[in-house]
Amino acid sequence: MTSASAFHFESLVWDWPIAIYLFLIGISAGLVTLAILLRRFHPEAGGSDSTLLRTTLVLGPGAIIFGLLILVFHLTRPWTFWKLMFHYSFTSVMSMGVMLFQLYMVVLVLWLAKIFEKEVIALQQRWLPRLGIVQKVLTLITPFHRALETLMLVLAVLLGAYTGFLLSALKSYPFLNNPILPVLFLFSGISSGAAVALIAMALRHRSNPHSTEAHFVHRMEVPVVWLEIFLLAAFFVGLALGDDGKMRALAAALGGGFWTWWFWLGVAGLGLILPMLLKPWANRSSTFHGVLAVCGASLTGVLLLRFFILYAGQLTVA
């Protein structure tokens, strides 16, 4: 299989914009999950001055919006997307996802607005002085903020897993119809969120790379990566022990060819092994370049994993 035919084949239904969309959704869910856990375990480090929280403020909703824009304009008839926004079907995975996105965005905006309350009120008083309802809403949220935060954590986990459910719903593709996929995408999303957060921290605090939140993200990152490796192994073992369709799908993906090299060099080599090899050097040097090398490789590996699962998963039809 050539590189051209690897991205264009007869059984292909979803192509590269979907992979980028899944990648961006994972970053948002990962950042929000880490931010909430930071506030629970280290409340003093999870205020409005936190780099992790500020990164979440920008990329939490930003990645979702950008990902949805990619998805909408990739549709054959993008102007019909509004129907999905208001016509719900509990039997459609896509429709359930739209409902989840809407609830996620509403709760995310309220949660972030309360954390950055002083900044929000200052902006409101400067630009929209007559919009006094903003302060009233933020005051009403105060007694329920912790419950709102718990709900936000649940929604972030569901959103991270949903990216895997979306693909596993393609039942005619044995490779994708796998119950491990949602969990794998959840933890790889948290891994990508950790990488983005550490890059942001290194950019903002070049003179102090050992802050409380940086230590917290590092502690979270290590078990998440090992769990990601375990889930990948379990994913492939499940295919190997499955029926004829799953074994054919595994052989097509890892039995040689373009996507086999993509996985071993890109996902495993660049995304998992290289960051582990570079980490001791990055920890000793404590420089921005070290963090960028490790986290950049990890982030690229997560993106390559999305491409691998999406394309290799559509090579074989049941």
Model features per residue range: what roles?
Residues 1-12, 47, 86-88, 119-142, ...:
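Extramembrane terminal tails and long inter-domain/linker segments of multi-pass membrane proteins
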Residues 1-43, 307, 311-315:
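N-terminal signal-anchor module of multipass membrane proteins
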Residues 22-27, 41-44, 107-286:
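Long, contiguous internal "core" modules enriched in hydrophobic/ aromatic residues
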Residues 27-107:
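Membrane helical hairpin/interfacial module
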